Every structure is written in C-alpha cells, then in structure tokens.
C-alpha cells in the first residue's frame, strides 16, 4: 500500500487527475472505476478542465460506477447517474453507452439480483477495471460496503448503515424518500481492479484513514481490505493523515520513491 500525503485537498485532486490521465493515455481502451460523494467532485472538476484544454480525450474510455441507490430512477436529482452526468459525463466526450451505473430503480429482489450479476459480467466483458477511484466513509466503508461486508463480496444489494443514511440525508429534501438500500460493487469486485486509488481529505476522515492503513485487517473496516491489494495508492491531505502513527515514515518513503524515479539512489 502506497501512502501519499499532500498539503491540501486541491493537491489530492490534482494527483488523482494525473493518475487518471496516465491510465487513459497508456491503455488502448481504458476502463475506469468511478466513485460519487463529495471527495471525487474536485477530481472530476480537474478532469473537465484538462479535457477543455485538449489535454485528454475520453472517447475510448469505459467507466463503471461503484454503486447506486435502490428505488430511485436514473433521472432522480439524487441518483448517482445524475451525479455523474452533472459533475463529469456531460462535460467531456465520453460515449454515453460506455458509462455504466448499476441499474437499481426496481425494488424487486429478483430483478436487482439479475442486475448485479449483469454488472459483474459487464465489467468482465470490458476487460476488468484498470484504475478504481475510491473515497472512504467515516465508518470505513468503500462503495456501499458497510462494516461486516465480506472481503470476497461481489456486486449485490446492501443495507446502508445508520451513519451512512445520516451522512447522506443532507442531499434529500425534507419528507422526500431517502433510500436505505443500494446496489454496490463488492469488496472482491474492487480488489479485482488492476490498480486502486483512494482519496481522503479533511479531519472527519482521519479516524477511518488510520483504521484502514494502520489497523488490523478486519471486516469492521471494509477499506482495510486494500491492505491486500498489490497496487493500492492512498492519497491524503494533511488533515486526513493527522492521526497516522507512521506519518513521517510514509513521507520519507515517498521522498525516497521520488528520488528513485529520478535516478537518485543516494
């Protein structure tokens, strides 16, 4: 696990954007795993700027989002399809049919199970995910894989924790239906990605970040599963990294890694 600590949330977004662009420019038919929530918005803003300045094209890119609420239409203001259209897809040249968000409008269990299986199959048919972007919840969730989620789990129906429902309540109007269920990629699905980049910013994420990086491997902190991934990069701002016991060591490692990259082995 590579831990990179940067001065600010803006620096985290710039680093993540550079990684995404590198994948797009390296792979013939790049496949990205995308996330929603407040943290990736800054990343998507940077990607739009890079596209508008003609530094990148998404024409040959395929994307798969981590999750979607169950029981609301794609067109709903708070659906993750709407989120992605608003913050990224509508502003770049990605082909609409190459963008995938779990189909979760139905509330029929059988239909949702089939949708989950189809999503897994679509990822495989695309050749797997080259780079999966992640955020982290205050309880350590990734995607909507809440505490106690199996590390072997695949795309499935998941009940949201109370803390997740409360955290997302601000996005829904008073009296409006707020889903308590989601269709989400499983932890096993995420771990199948060839590379993972998790972004975390702000003091509110510091405890979850510490548990993920320095805590035990445990289903109680779903993000700790990234300890098992051979190409997981955790990019933090100073506030999110503030509780790490080995913070100075991670910074030292990154300094030495940069020297090696530049050919300096002193």
Curated annotation (Swiss-Prot):
Belongs to the glucosamine/galactosamine-6-phosphate isomerase family. NagB subfamily. This is Glucosamine-6-phosphate deaminase. Homohexamer. Pathway: Amino-sugar metabolism; N-acetylneuraminate degradation; D-fructose 6-phosphate from N-acetylneuraminate: step 5/5. PANTHER family: GLUCOSAMINE-6-PHOSPHATE ISOMERASE (PTHR11280:SF5). One of its GO terms (cellular component) is cytoplasm. Its EC number is 3.5.99.6. SUPFAM superfamilies: NagB/RpiA/CoA transferase-like. It catalyses: alpha-D-glucosamine 6-phosphate + H2O = beta-D-fructose 6-phosphate + NH4(+). GO terms for biological process: carbohydrate metabolic process; glucosamine catabolic process; N-acetylglucosamine catabolic process; N-acetylneuraminate catabolic process. HAMAP family: GlcN6P_deamin. InterPro entries: Glc/Gal-6P_isomerase, Glucosamine6P_isomerase, Glucosamine6P_isomerase_CS, NagB/RpiA_transferase-like. Catalyzes the reversible isomerization-deamination of glucosamine 6-phosphate (GlcN6P) to form fructose 6-phosphate (Fru6P) and ammonium ion. It comes from Marinomonas sp. (strain MWYL1). Keywords: Carbohydrate metabolism, Hydrolase. The active site is at 67 (proton acceptor), 139 (for ring-opening step), 141 (proton acceptor), 146 (for ring-opening step). GO terms for molecular function: glucosamine-6-phosphate deaminase activity; identical protein binding. It is an enzyme of class 3 (hydrolase).
């Amino acid at each position: 696990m590579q831990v990179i600590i940067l001065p600010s949330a803006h620096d985290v977004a710039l680093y993540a954007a550079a990684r995404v662009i590198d994948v797009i420019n390296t792979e013939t038919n790049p496949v990205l795993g995308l996330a929603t929530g407040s943290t990736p918005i800054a990343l998507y803003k940077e990607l739009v700027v890079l596209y508008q300045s003609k530094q990148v094209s998404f024409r040959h890119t395929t994307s798969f989002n981590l999750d979607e609420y169950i029981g609301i239409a794609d067109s709903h203001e708070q659906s993750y399809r709407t989120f992605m259209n608003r913050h990224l897809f509508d502003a770049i040249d990605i082909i609409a049919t190459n963008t995938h968000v779990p189909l979760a409008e139905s509330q029929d269990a059988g239909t949702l199970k089939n949708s989950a299986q189809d999503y897994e199959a679509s990822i495989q048919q695309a050749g797997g995910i080259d780079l999966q972007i992640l955020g982290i919840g205050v309880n350590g969730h990734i995607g909507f894989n809440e505490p106690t989620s199996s590390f072997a789990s695949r795309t499935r129906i998941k009940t949201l924790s109370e803390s997740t429902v409360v955290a997302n309540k601000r996005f829904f109007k008073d009296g409006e239906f707020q889903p308590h269920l989601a269709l989400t990629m499983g932890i096993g699905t995420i771990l199948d990605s060839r590379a993972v980049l998790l972004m975390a910013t702000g003091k509110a994420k510091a405890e979850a970040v510490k548990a993920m990086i320095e805590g035990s491997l445990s289903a109680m902190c779903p993000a700790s599963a990234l300890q098992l991934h051979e190409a997981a990069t955790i990019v933090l701002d100073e506030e999110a990294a503030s509780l790490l016991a080995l913070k100075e060591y991670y910074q030292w490692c990154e300094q030495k890694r940069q020297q090696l990259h530049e050919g300096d082995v002193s």
